[in-house]
């Protein structure tokens, strides 16, 4: 894989990769940035949730789960001192659907964590990554009811 960033001004860049899409990168104003793009560490967090989200929804669809909405959130803790690396992460999978199986969701999370997601594989070598989930029953008209909440643990 090849990627590139091109400097625009101050601490603003445009990133590109083999896919051909452009992505704005920037920094906080207090360090000289224009705040007109993603910060690099934000992109690492988005890469983690994006990678596992694609795995999990693909697996749930293959298992014929009736998912009507799906979000993955991540909370990443960082070191206090520079270079302020990631020290831990908690992924939370929010699934809305009709009779979504907890067993199917846990298996999808497990496959993503241990087999499919290169972002988790890399970041998991340097920090703990916890996995939490919640399943909501889609009751129509934008209404949903929490069915189950849990945590997936792996070594």
Residues covered by each model-derived region:
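Extended beta-strand/beta-hairpin segments
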Residues: 1-46, 57-155
